Regions:
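N-terminal basic/disordered segments at the start of proteins
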Residues: 2-23
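Hydrophobic faces of well-ordered beta-strands that scaffold small-molecule active sites
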Residues: 14-16, 40-42, 67, 89-91
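Long, charge-rich, low-complexity intrinsically disordered regions
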Residues: 23, 29-32, 42, 102
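Active-site mouth loops of central-metabolism enzymes
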Residues: 35-47, 109
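Amphipathic, hydrophobic secondary-structure cores in small proteins
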Residues: 47-73
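Alpha-helix-loop-beta-strand connector modules within alpha/beta enzyme cores
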Residues: 73-96
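Short, charged, surface-exposed secondary-structure boundary motifs
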Residues: 97-103
């Protein structure tokens, strides 16, 4: 069951997770806060780390997770499964990503 979010009572919390070899989710993170939104930006070295971060973001109370273009179809499915579909998971989508020598994250991670 999806979590209910009341925009008038809380700031809207969302997460943006990006993947790149060498990222450390414990140090490669930032919080961007505006009047109505808190966005957690977290870098992960692979899909496994991203699954752990997604679960952390669910516990933090995020209403949605956005994934960078490095996540292929398999990666998006893994993150959705990691949060047990309790919150929506969306993604910027590239069939192949120029930053990864025209490969999908599915081929790398």
């Amino acid at each position: 069951m999806a979590r209910k979010f009341k925009l008038n009572e809380d700031k809207f919390k969302v997460a943006f997770i990006f993947a790149n070899e060498g990222c450390n989710p414990k140090k490669d993170r930032s919080i961007i806060e505006s009047e109505k939104i808190i966005m957690y930006v977290v870098g992960c070295a692979d899909y496994s780390q991203a699954e752990t971060v997604a679960q952390e973001m669910l516990e933090e109370g995020c209403a949605a997770i956005d994934l960078c273009g490095a996540f292929g179809n398999e990666g998006v499915a893994r993150i959705s499964k990691a949060v047990d579909r309790q919150i929506p998971v969306g993604a910027v989508h590239f069939d192949f990503h120029p930053a990864f020598r025209d490969k999908s994250g599915d081929e790398i991670y």
